[in-house]
Amino acid sequence: MIQQETYLTVADNSGAKRLQCIRVLGSNRRYAHVGDVIVAAVKDAVPNMGVKKSDVVKAVVVRTKATLRRETGNSIRFDDNAAVLINEDKNPRGTRVFGPVARELRERNYTKIVSLAPEVI
């Protein structure tokens, strides 16, 4: 579960390294799970890339440390909280995605992120 003030790692090559969640998008929502969109501030970035430190960006959560329960009864949990930066059209800002992503992203129409990911769990 991601909430305000939560730090996340960035799972793409957009130039940002760490994000801090500012707001979970949706009608008065407190927590974000895999596939949810958040507004975040860039806390650490690579120099001379598309994003700079203190930029406010939108990102979709791709991995959470909290257990993710599936309808089949399975549950998965990742080692870190990670997000991928997106633009207004919900397309990723980077050209590569690092690490595994959850299958729930495909159900939420983030097919571009799923196709860039090396592994879908």
Curated annotation (Swiss-Prot):
Keyword Transport applies: no
Keywords of this entry: Ribonucleoprotein, Ribosomal protein, RNA-binding, rRNA-binding
Gene3D superfamilies membership: Ribosomal protein L14 (2.40.150.20)
InterPro entries: Ribosomal_uL14, Ribosomal_uL14_bac-type, Ribosomal_uL14_sf
Pfam family name, one: Ribosomal_L14
One cellular component term from this protein's GO annotations in UniProt: cytosolic large ribosomal subunit
BP GO terms, sorted: translation
Origin superkingdom: Bacteria
Xref: SUPFAM superfamilies: Ribosomal protein L14
Keyword check for Ribonucleoprotein: yes
One MF term in the entry's GO annotations: structural constituent of ribosome
Its job: Binds to 23S rRNA. Forms part of two intersubunit bridges in the 70S ribosome.
Binding partners and assembly: Part of the 50S ribosomal subunit. Forms a cluster with proteins L3 and L19. In the 70S ribosome, L14 and L19 interact and together make contacts with the 16S rRNA in bridges B5 and B8.
Similarity remark: Belongs to the universal ribosomal protein uL14 family.
Name of the protein: Large ribosomal subunit protein uL14
Organism listed in the record: Prochlorococcus marinus (strain SARG / CCMP1375 / SS120)
